Each structure stands twice: as C-alpha cells, then as structure tokens.
Swiss-Prot record:
Residues modified as Phosphotyrosine: 399, 499
Full protein name: Cysteine-rich receptor-like protein kinase 19
Keyword terms, alphabetized: ATP-binding, Glycoprotein, Kinase, Membrane, Nucleotide-binding, Phosphoprotein, Receptor, Repeat, Serine/threonine-protein kinase, Signal, Transferase, Transmembrane, Transmembrane helix
Lineage, opening ranks: Eukaryota, Viridiplantae, Streptophyta, Embryophyta, Tracheophyta
Cytoplasmic side: 284-645
InterPro entries according to UniProt: GNK2 (IPR002902), GNK2_sf (IPR038408), Kinase-like_dom_sf (IPR011009), Prot_kinase_dom (IPR000719), Protein_kinase_ATP_BS (IPR017441), Ser-Thr/Tyr_kinase_cat_dom (IPR001245), Ser/Thr_kinase_AS (IPR008271)
Stretches assigned to the Extracellular side: 21-262
Organism: Arabidopsis thaliana (Mouse-ear cress)
A single GO molecular function term of this UniProt record: protein serine kinase activity
C-alpha cells in the first residue's frame, strides 16, 4: 500500500450503531497531484455528478451501491457510493447526501477524492474507478484497549483466521459483504465485518481484503482498515445491525420471537434431523463394510479411483483456515499443477497444501491420479500424502510439510549449493534410488513416476530426499512391463528417448531420469543447459560422455566440493549414471541393480555406450550412429504433448 496512514484511534463513539441517523465522519483522502480550477469544465462536471448521486430515487439507495459519470474526456468525472448492507435506504441516502455536501469543502480543488463515513463511502475521480482495484491512500484505525483474558499472540490467531474466511465469503458473494462472530471464550466475543465495492471481480475483492486484513496488528480489542475498494473491521461489540445482515456464521442462533414460528421450526426440523441421522448411520455402516471389502480385494490393473481414498478427505474450510485463506505470504511455490502453500492444521501439524489451478485443463486428471497413487505409498523417501479436498471447483492435496524446499533450490544456486557437500549428495543419490526402487518393486503396486527431476525431490530437516509430485505417475498391472501413450507428459530434459519420441514408457524410463538427476547432483549443473567442449556443444549428458571418453570424468565434479570427496566414489557414480542414460532401454540397469551398485563397490560395472540424446559433433555424425539431437529440448518445464500414432 503506497500511502497507508497508520495511527491509534480511541473509539469514543462505540455506542453508535448501524441504525443511527447521524452520519459519523471517519477519514478522507484527496489527490494533491491533479487539481482543477473553480470555473473549469471539470468543476462543472463534478458538481453535476455529486448532485446526481445525492438525488436518486429511494430504490436506488436500497441497493446500497451506485456509479455515475458526468461529462466527456478529458474532463469526464466518474463517481460511486457504497453504503453498508445493514443500513436502511433512508440512512444510506442521508449519509451520501451528507458526504456530497462536505466533498468540495474537504477536497475543494482535487480531481480525485475518497470519503469514509461510518455508514457509507463516497468516491470520485478523473480516471475510471469502476471495477478497478485500488488500495492506495487508506487508513488503519485501532482501539487503545488490549484484549482481555487472552494472550496477544493467541488473540491474533483467533481473529485473523475468521477474518480471512469472511474475506473469502465476501469475495464470492453478490454484494461483496460478510460478517463474522468470533468467540474468544465462554464470556467474550468479537464481531468482524468485511466489504468490497460490488463492482470488483472476486479475485480483486479477495486481494484487497487480504491486503487490508494483514495490515492490522491485532494486538488491540478493536481495529479497522479503510481502503478505496474495500474495508474491514473487528470489535468486541456488534457494531453492525445483526437483524439486517442475519446471524453471523460463527455465532449460535438466537431464539425467535413468535411462539407459532417456534412450533413450526420444531415440527419441521426434528423429523428432518432424525431422518438425517438415520441416513448417516446407514451410509457409515455401508462405507465401513466397503472399506473392509476393498482391503481384501486385489487391486485391478485400471480399477483404481479416488473413492478408495475417502478416509483421507479434508473439509475445504479446514484447509482455508490452515493456510489463512491461501495467504500469499504462505505460498511455497508454483508449478503446472497449481500453487503450493504452507499451512497449519488445528492440531498444530504443519502441512504443504497443493491447490489445483482452476485454469489447468490437465490438472484435474493428474489430481485424481495423484490421490489414488500416493495414498497407497509409505516410504521414508517418498513425500507422505495426508489427505485431499474435492469440493466444488476446489481440488486440493495435503502433504506432509518438508522444510528445506526442493533439490534444485540447492543444486543450481551458487550460494545454497555450499550446503550440499559430497557426503550429503551421495546420501541423497542413495535415498532417491531407494525411493524409486520402492515404487518399481517393493510397494504393493508397480508405479512409474514419469516426472523425476530435481524440482520434484524435496529435502527434509536432515537433507534426506523425498520424491514428490505423482500427478504424472502410472500404475502397472501385475505382469505389465511397459506401456504406450499418445499423451507424453513430464520434463524433456529428463525423458528417455523411447518415451519422448514414441510415447513408450516403463521402469527403464524412470531409470533414465534417475541417471540425468545423478549427473546434475554430481556437477551442480542443469542438463537443460548447453556446455561446450572441443568446439562441440551439448547438454550435460553429452558433456559427461565426452569427459568419460577422454578419460577425465573428474572434471565434471562440482568445484564447491574442493578436495573433500573420494575420486573413486564419484567416478563410480558417474559410471552408474551413464549406464542409466543408455539409448537402448534394455542396456539400462534395473533400480534394484543400481541400489546394489551404490551400496557395494564389489559389483563390476558394464562399459557404457554413447547415451541417448547424445549431441554428436561433425566427426561423430559421419559415423553410422543415428543422431538423436533433433529430438532433444532444453525446456525445463513439465509438459504434456499429444503425439499422432
């Protein structure tokens, strides 16, 4: 916010309610950079605009929001007013009229102005302000009273989450308005209110409210923030007219006034409640029996679906609360699937929340696939799925929180890579290998990951690797060894030749990706980059093969290691990696063999041949080998490509 004015404000007028007829002035802001003269066309247009806003018919004020324009460019004036939803049309008209009469006194020569009152907002500008987000020139007002019987850090958490939930509700509503009652304890409650101008898009309203809500310090018993496009407030009394807005969502229902209405409510609600409870009991028993049956039945080759993971389902409101309504500051990263946020469940457990982008056409299938696949996996080198949410348009995965981000964050940063010496990197290579072996052989299902890369390897507190992002994974049947697809997904730099060119994938496809990953871990360089040697240019795999052929594989080693590594150990890892990236899938080792090769040096290694996607020099192109370089891309992003058969 460019010009937020912040100060402590004692609420001396706490007895004023939304139904009060007296208009209570709060604050105004004038644009001192653009002015007009008293006899100008703009001055005439502004007076016309203000007069029209204050002389509408009664029905116009009942909506609580109106816009208007006067004149032609460059002297056109656009204006609007917004009244609180809980005030009557008479109070709205009174407030707007009062504001109009004060406008030219408070901002006599300014082309832009915004005026805040307890019951309404008035705004005008020489720019188009309709359906346009503006968070400049706001004000933060705060009570001088401290919270009672609640620690300040607890108080902030108690208030912030409901206010963010109210912001989401307001952004989705037609009137862009929401209230909340927040119970601090058995005897203390707070009341919250958020609002936007109804012309804003849902996302603009939510962004505006989040900016405002997070400007408040929440260390006092009451506070509010006023912005041109939105406002929010909380206090320890009902400062809005509850009868006009309905009971706040978090509060308990109050008893009705009429005896007949109470009888009708009891007569209708009790039978419905009993019927509902009976249905819940029946479906619970059936669901339990179904889960028991599913545990006993063998897994079909293609019969897995998201319903088998029903016990993992989260409520969307719980996820919103955990992430503070997907607060931008909690964002951990973003990919083709969507955004990932850090969250804290009500139990105190930290989680990573992966939210499917609503514009992602491919993400919906990958979402259901990831739930089905990961829900069945348990291994120390695989990220753990805690649950999911499938509610309306929302598709969310909840994972264990892994604090050290992904491997690429360390490998390809000149400063961060210093935290990964060779001992740690060797440990990471072994952990990744064991994780893939579990997917291929040791789990109940045979799973091909199809998108193994540094960005999908997370590191925990002890730098142990955890394979993540199973959106592209495929489950193989009992005797299935390979599959074909017209929909090639993954990351080109890590794809095996047979998969990238023909859509054929198998366990050996993951082995190829693992080989590329090992070379990146050893060198600290990206396979997608180009490297020059002997007047020839190639990717990391090509560069490694040339070094190997010249008898100088140690030149691949990350200089950040210094002399703190065993040459024989690193050379063996390079050798294993080259075996993994062989052009012919049959020439690549299995993951079980790779784990054994990494575990003991007693196993002899085969001599590697030129790898797949090998960039050949002019001299090499003269040979009989087929040049595969035309099929190689340096794109790092996970892609989906449909190929004709």
């Amino acid at each position: 916010m460019s010009s937020l004015i912040s100060f402590i404000f004692l609420f001396l007028f706490s007895s004023i309610t939304a139904s009060a007829q007296n208009t209570f002035y709060l604050y105004h802001n004038c644009s001192v950079t653009t002015t007009f003269s008293s006899n100008s066309t703009y001055s005439t247009n502004l007076k016309t605009l203000l007069s029209s806003l204050s002389s509408l018919n009664a029905s116009s004020y009942s909506t609580g929001f109106q816009t208007a324009t006067a004149g032609q460019a460059p002297d056109r004036v656009t204006g609007l007013f917004l009244c609180r939803v809980d005030v009557s049309s008479e109070v709205c008209r009174s407030c707007v009229t009062f504001a109009v009469n004060e406008t030219l006194t408070r901002c006599p020569k300014d082309k832009e102005g915004v005026f805040y009152y307890e019951q309404c907002l008035l705004r005008y500008s020489n720019r188009n302000i309709v359906a346009t987000l503006n968070t400049d020139g706001g004000m933060f007002m705060q009570s001088a009273r401290n919270p009672l019987s609640v620690k300040q850090d607890q108080f902030r958490d108690l208030v912030l989450t409901p206010m963010n939930l109210a912001a989401v509700e307001a952004a989705r509503s037609f009137k862009k308005w929401a209230v909340r009652k927040i119970d601090l304890n058995a005897s203390q409650s707070l009341y919250g209110m958020v609002r936007c101008t109804p012309d804003l898009r849902e996302q603009d309203c939510l962004d505006c409210l989040k900016i405002g809500i997070n400007q408040v310090t929440y260390d006092k018993i009451g506070g509010r923030i006023l912005l041109p496009s939105c406002a929010s407030r909380y206090d320890n009394y009902a400062f809005y007219n509850e009868s006009n807005v309905g009971t706040p969502q978090d509060s308990s229902p109050r008893p009705g006034k009429g005896g007949n209405s109470s009888v009708i409510i009891i007569a209708v609600v009790v039978p419905i409640t009993v019927l509902f409870l009976l249905l819940v009991a029946v479906f619970s028993v059936r669901a339990k029996n179904k889960r028991t049956l599913n545990e006993k039945e063998p897994v079909a080759e293609d019969g897995n679906d998201i319903t088998t993971a029903g016990s993992l389902q989260f409520d969307f409101k719980a996820i919103e609360a955990a992430t503070n309504c997907f607060l931008p500051i909690n964002k951990l990263g973003q990919g083709g699937f969507g955004e990932v946020y850090k969250g804290t469940l009500s139990s105190g457990l930290q989680v990573a929340v992966k939210r499917l982008s609503k514009t992602s056409g491919q993400g919906e299938k990958e979402f259901e696939n990831e739930v089905v696949v990961v829900a069945k996996l348990q291994h120390r080198n695989l990220v753990k799925l805690l649950g999911y949410c499938l509610e309306g348009e929302e598709k969310i995965l909840v994972y264990e929180f892994v604090p050290n981000k992904s491997l690429d964050h360390f490998l390809f940063d000149s400063t961060m890579k210093m935290k990964l010496d060779w001992t740690r990197r060797y440990k990471i290579i072994g952990g990744i290998a064991r994780g893939i072996l579990y997917l291929h052989q040791d789990s109940r299902l045979t799973i091909i990951h199809r998108d193994l890369k540094a960005g999908n390897i997370l590191l925990d507190d002890d730098m142990n690797p955890k394979i993540a992002d199973f959106g592209m994974a495929r489950i193989f049947g009992m005797d299935q060894t390979e599959a074909m697809t017209r929909r090639v997904v993954g990351t080109y730099g890590y794809m095996s030749p047979e998969y990238a060119m023909y859509g054929q994938f198998s366990m050996k496809s993951d082995v190829y990706s693992f080989g590329v990953l090992v070379l990146e871990i050893i060198s600290g360089m990206k396979n997608s980059s180009l490297y020059q040697m002997d007047e020839s240019v190639g990717n990391l795999v090509t560069y490694t093969w040339r070094l190997w052929s010249n008898g100088s594989p140690s030149e691949l080693v990350d200089p950040s290691f210094g002399d703190n590594y065993q040459t024989s150990e690193i050379t063996r890892c390079i050798h294993i990696a080259l075996l993994c990236v062989q052009e012919d899938a049959e020439d690549r080792p299995t993951m079980s063999s790779i784990v054994q090769m990494l575990t003991t040096s007693l196993i002899a290694l085969a001599e590697p041949r030129p790898p797949g996607f090998f960039f050949r020099s002019k001299q090499e192109q003269a040979g009989p080998s087929i040049d595969s370089s035309t099929h190689c891309s340096v794109d790092e992003a996970s892609i989906t490509r449909v190929t004709p058969r």
